[in-house]
Amino acid sequence: KNISAMHMVSDHFTDANKDIFILKRQTDASNNTQQLSLDGNSPLATNTPPLAADSVAFASATIFGQEASNNTYVYAAKFDLVITTTAGGIPTVASDRKIIVRNNPPGQETWNVVPAAIQISAAPYLTFQVSSVTSSSTVKWIGNLELTVVT
């Protein structure tokens, strides 16, 4: 089946759930900083992993970027995050651990990934900002995000 997210809820309590998301985006010389989404487009309420107001969330992610025409040039990072969200829906990355698994962009280019706890229409969401400081590379980014939200 073709899905980009999976939602799990416990039989024993209703204030927590776990979701698994596949995220995508592309960067190039003209658009060198982007945010990942479920459909590879700009983050909207319908295509971005949601958080919840007045909650804590635990996230684990692997984000991978590869030059579109040469699989030698890659960037890979793993993240463990704790995100807190106020009753008003303002999310904050309270704790993060980033492990760069591979950092091999071409020449003098710089590629990077950072977590982004954002609001869309006053609701909290989690995504990742990907960047490639480049004059010529097109980088395809993909991410695997596991997100547990407790309200």
How should each PLM-predicted stretch be described?
Residues 1-17:
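Structural motif
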Residues 145-151:
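Short beta-strand-to-coil "C-cap" segments at the C-terminal boundary of structured domains/repeats
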Residues 13-56, 64-75, 86-96, 103-138, ...:
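Surface-exposed ligand/attachment interfaces on beta-rich extracellular proteins
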Residues 137-145:
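Edge beta-strands of jelly-roll/beta-sandwich modules across compartments, strongly enriched
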Residues 77-81:
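Compact beta-sheet-dominated globular domain cores
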